[in-house]
Swiss-Prot record:
Belongs to the universal ribosomal protein uS11 family. GO terms for cellular component: chloroplast; ribonucleoprotein complex; ribosome. The keyword rRNA-binding applies. This is Small ribosomal subunit protein uS11c. Keywords: Chloroplast, Plastid, Ribonucleoprotein, Ribosomal protein, RNA-binding, rRNA-binding. Coiled coil: none annotated. Part of the 30S ribosomal subunit. One of its GO terms (molecular function) is rRNA binding. One of its GO terms (biological process) is translation.
Length: 129
């Protein structure tokens, strides 16, 4: 009879000294995700997941809370230096930057990656109220 060896699996948390903070602000919501330089997501948060509902999800307070939660999760995993990618036209973009700075992370660069058309598709008709 063959004896099988028991495999012992060690679970270790990886340390991520560098990372990228992706902040997407829309007119209705805020999404924040923190990834390593390769693009693998370490931590994320959204204003809906933080407990804000309906039109309150797009406020600067919601942006600050959402950013703080996502970045604190990443700091627990050893994050120290970040690049910031901001996209979208929503409110609270500056609030998110101040929040990342206040949490003690070193910011290496800030990029605005909002997609802008070079006169591509025709926009939808104007809203009349």
């Amino acid at each position: 009879m063959i004896k099988q060896k028991k495999k012992i699996i060690k679970i270790t948390k990886k340390k991520f000294p560098k990372g990228i903070v992706h902040i997407k602000t829309t007119y209705n919501n805020v999404l924040v995700s923190v990834s390593d330089p390769k693009g693998n997501v370490i931590a994320w948060s959204s204003s809906g997941a933080c407990g804000f509902k309906s039109s309150k999800k797009a406020t600067p307070l919601a942006t600050k809370t959402t950013t703080a939660i996502a970045v604190k999760k990443a700091i627990e995993q050893g994050l120290q230096k970040v690049e910031i990618n901001i996209s979208g036209p929503g409110t609270g973009r500056e609030t998110a930057l101040k929040c990342v700075q206040s949490l003690g992370l070193r910011i290496s660069c800030i990029r605005d990656v909002t997609p802008l058309p070079h006169n591509g598709c025709r926009p939808s008709k104007r809203r009349r109220i």
